[in-house]
Amino acid sequence: GAIAGGDPAPGFEYGNSPAALLAAELAGCRVVMSTAAGVRGLQRFRDARQLFAASLVCGRATAAAIRAAGADEVCFVITGEWVDRDGDEDVACADYIEALLRGEPAPAEDFARRVRDSDFGRRFVAGTWPNLPLADLELAAHVDRFDFAMPVAREGEHLVIR
């Protein structure tokens, strides 16, 4: 769980650092995810017919899952746009998935560059936020690192990604 800036939320062992989680032994563990904005965005649209969590690291797989679901319309929820940042890391992800869905050229490096050059990406490069290591930025900008989508299911009051 994380709060703005990537710090671990009270009661959570980890913050919002993918690099820190790479070394964590989580096999067989239930993982509860809480981000500064992404989880709230999912909650806000919990009643959508189909809901996916997405990022550049699984963009192509997400586009394939959307296509397989036969969606006539797709709505992208941009949660990274705040008063102090442009949110282009989220917009780049949406633009990438949209280009794939439309069959348009989608050069991975163009979208990765947008993540690195976004307001939030520059915070990682600056090195002034202890819970925003540069390794996280490189992981976030690794387009199509994973070949799975993250469909979100409703289980009672909870949203679950499996």
Located regions from the model:
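A short aromatic-anchored loop/beta-hairpin motif
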Residues: G1-G6
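Long, charged alpha-helical interface segments
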Residues: G11-R30, S34-A36, F45-Q50, D88-R162
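Short alpha-helices
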Residues: A36-V39, Q43-E104
